[in-house]
């Protein structure tokens, strides 16, 4: 009789444990561990536009992150369900028609920054590269010469990650790449004499000074968006 009771107790405990295990498998993951089913790609020229897309790469929402971006989004209402690369091309056309590529930065056309939010779903392994290629096609089609810079998960400085959240700041190396692209300078030709990370009036900025081919450059890069905030250079042989 005692043996039967022990056997029954053991079987009951096993059943309870199995039920708990199965319930855990069927329960939704906690917010911190759930896999994202959407992604966010931000396009920055002067307008900053946040593009939200689903696992299939279809656009679900557009949001202007500054006043210029809001104006572009208002002028482009027909985007829901379109492929992300097609929306990017359309936005480049809209931005060009609005005159944002007219002004140069330090003698060169403005960079186009494509920034992928950390943890975003990737419809394909080459998603960001494909978006960059589509943007480049749009740029060439408009006879523009803007450089294109991409920012993905590997380009955020892990030293500033905390509380399980990714760092909001790009790395110094990415800031240097952005500066060189805007200046139209090859990395092999550049020597960085000064590089500081500072909060200028509350804005996180990389302050960079470098020389290339005898010219002296001073560039400020926004540490969150990757936008060029300041850009100037002194040509070799000219006076200060």
Predicted regions span which residues?
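Bacterial N-terminal signal peptides that target proteins for export
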Residues: 2-12
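Charge-biased, low-complexity intrinsically disordered regions
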Residues: 5, 67-72, 76-97, 102, ...
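C-terminal motif of bacterial Sec signal peptides marking the signal peptidase cleavage site
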Residues: 20-24
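Bacterial signal peptide processing site
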Residues: 26-29
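Extracytoplasmic
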Residues: 35-40, 46-48, 54-59, 107-111, ...
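Post-signal-peptide N-terminal segment of Sec-exported extracytoplasmic proteins
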Residues: 45, 51-75
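Short, non-transmembrane alpha-helical segments in secretory-pathway proteins
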Residues: 84, 88, 94-96, 166-198
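Exposed beta-strand-loop-beta-strand "reactive/processing" segments of non-cytosolic proteins
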Residues: 117, 125-130, 135, 185-232, ...
């Amino acid at each position: 009789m005692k043996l039967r009771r022990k056997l029954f107790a053991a079987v009951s405990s096993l059943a309870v444990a199995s039920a708990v295990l199965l319930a855990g498998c069927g329960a939704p993951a906690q917010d911190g561990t759930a896999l994202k089913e959407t992604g966010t790609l931000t396009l920055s020229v002067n307008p900053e536009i946040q593009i939200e897309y689903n696992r299939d790469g279809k656009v679900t929402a557009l949001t202007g992150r500054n006043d210029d971006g809001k104006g572009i989004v208002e002028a482009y209402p027909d985007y829901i369900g379109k492929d992300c690369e097609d929306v990017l091309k359309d936005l480049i056309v809209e931005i060009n028609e609005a005159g944002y590529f007219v002004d140069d930065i330090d003698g060169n056309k403005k960079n186009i920054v494509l920034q992928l939010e950390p943890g975003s779903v990737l419809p394909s392994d080459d998603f960001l590269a494909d978006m960059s290629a589509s943007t480049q096609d749009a740029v060439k089609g408009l006879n523009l010469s803007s450089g294109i810079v991409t920012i993905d998960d590997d380009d955020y400085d892990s030293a500033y990650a905390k509380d399980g959240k990714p760092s909001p700041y790009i790395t110094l190396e990415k800031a240097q790449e952005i500066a060189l692209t805007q200046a139209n300078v090859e990395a092999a030709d550049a020597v960085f004499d000064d590089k500081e990370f500072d909060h200028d009036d509350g804005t996180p900025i990389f302050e960079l000074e470098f020389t290339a081919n005898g010219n002296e450059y001073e560039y400020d890069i926004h540490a969150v968006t990757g936008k060029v905030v300041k850009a100037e250079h002194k040509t070799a042989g000219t006076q200060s």
